[in-house]
Amino acid sequence: EDLSFKYEHPEAYQQIEEKLKATQAERTNLFEEFTAPIREQLDKMGLPYRILARIKSPYSIWNKMQNKHITFEEIYDILAVRIIFTPKNEEEELNDCFNIYVAISRIYKPHPDRLRDWVSHPKANGYQALHVTLMSNKGQWIEVQIRSERMNDVAEQGFAAHWKYKEGGGSEDEGELSKWLKTIK
């Protein structure tokens, strides 16, 4: 989509790229400030985790601007936060997702209409995650996606990645599958 957008609408693509670059430092600061108290809570929970910033693609930004008739500055979800954790065990994966949700909702006020539970009710393609939108201390809504490592692998590599968890993981074939999937991405 981004590649097509770049060549179909080069001026719009360039304008969005320039605005993304111009606001990058602001987004980085917001990410660091927003995630610092989340990291403290997750450390207390004792689950291994990583937190990533997800930046909306130029095409997705443009598409939202077109569909909602809004400006670049009016798009609140250019930055999203992704929490990827390793559950205590397979049986606790769902509970761990919701425990993380509860912990971060104590730090930041959740948007009452923006909780998406694809953990209890996965999408047809196998996608699972909790998406919640939280109000930062700077008054910005920020989407947070909560996923286990398994859920992240399925989201990034497709449902075929799910088999390694069913088989116990760690096989030589798993590495070959990952290499192959990266070549076709």
Residue positions per predicted region:
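Nucleic-acid processing machinery
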Residues: 1-185
